[in-house]
A protein has these predicted regions:
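Thiamine diphosphate
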Residues: 1-133
């Protein structure tokens, strides 16, 4: 079980977003057989490379395909899965926005988006990772 007392929160802050996502994913996968995470080629950056071996089949890497990530998530939600989509913030806003509007807005699919690194956090990766919108 994940705790949210002062000591636990201090420990979570030491491992960062990706470490907490791995901890949360292990916990959620242990209590929910339908828990699934979809990533768009950010398995290492999201920390999901550290998910327990017994839950590896719950992580789907669609490659550099943020638009398709939302489409795959929609299909899985439609089949009863609890889906979280992990994506760079800039790519969720710019590349997958149409799919987000249709799938989550119009179709009301309860996909949870976990967005990483907004702003200039990943400038070393190139200009496309800088979120200026």
């Amino acid at each position: 079980m994940l705790n949210f007392d002062k000591e636990s929160i201090l420990e979570y802050s030491k491992v960062g977003c990706s470490g907490v996502l791995a901890l949360a994913s292990n916990y959620l996968a242990s209590i929910d057989d339908k828990y699934t995470v979809i990533v768009s080629d950010i398995l290492h950056h999201s920390g999901l490379v550290n998910i327990d071996e017994k839950y590896k089949d719950r992580v789907i890497n669609v490659g550099i395909a943020e638009q398709n990530e939302i489409g795959v998530a929609t299909g899985l939600v439609n089949q009863g899965f609890e889906v979280y989509a992990s994506v760079y913030t800039g790519f969720a806003v710019a590349r997958a926005l149409d799919q987000i509007k249709v799938s989550m807005g119009y179709m009301q699919m309860p996909i949870k988006i976990i967005a990483f690194d907004s702003g200039f956090n990943d400038s070393s990766l190139g200009l496309v990772y800088n979120l200026k919108e």
